C-alpha cells in the first residue's frame, strides 16, 4: 500500500492568488494577513503572490472563475467572512458562495482552498481570524500549499 500526500512546502515558483472579500474587512484583513504569512513561511515568493479584492462574499465565485480561467495561477486561496444577521440573507450568501467556489474549482480542476468563515456572530469570526481559534486564513493557505504539492506529486 502506498500513501500519497502533499507537503507543506512550496517550491518557490508557484504563482498564487489570495482572493479576499472586503465586506467585514476587520475580519478579512486578518485572514489575508494570516494567508500571506503562511505563504512566505512555507517558501512562497512574494513576487508571485497576487491579492485580489472583491466587494463581498457573493462575488467571490465569479472572480474565482475569472482567475482560474486566466490560467495565470497555480492555485487560489479564497477568503471571506459571512456573519449571520437577523434576516435569511446569511443563508443565501453562504450557500451560493460555497457552491460557486466548489463549482469553479471542479470546472477548472485547479487547487482552491476555502477560507470563508460562516459564523453566527462577530465574536466567533474574531476568534477564527487570529485569536482563540487560530487564523483560518493561515489554515486555508496551508491547505492550498498541500494541494499544490499533491498535484505535483500526482503529475509524476
Swiss-Prot record:
The gene is ribH. Catalyzes the formation of 6,7-dimethyl-8-ribityllumazine by condensation of 5-amino-6-(D-ribitylamino)uracil with 3,4-dihydroxy-2-butanone 4-phosphate. This is the penultimate step in the biosynthesis of riboflavin. Keywords: Riboflavin biosynthesis, Transferase. GO terms for molecular function: 6,7-dimethyl-8-ribityllumazine synthase activity. Pfam families: DMRL_synthase (PF00885). Its EC number is 2.5.1.78. HAMAP family: Lumazine_synth. This is 6,7-dimethyl-8-ribityllumazine synthase. Belongs to the DMRL synthase family.
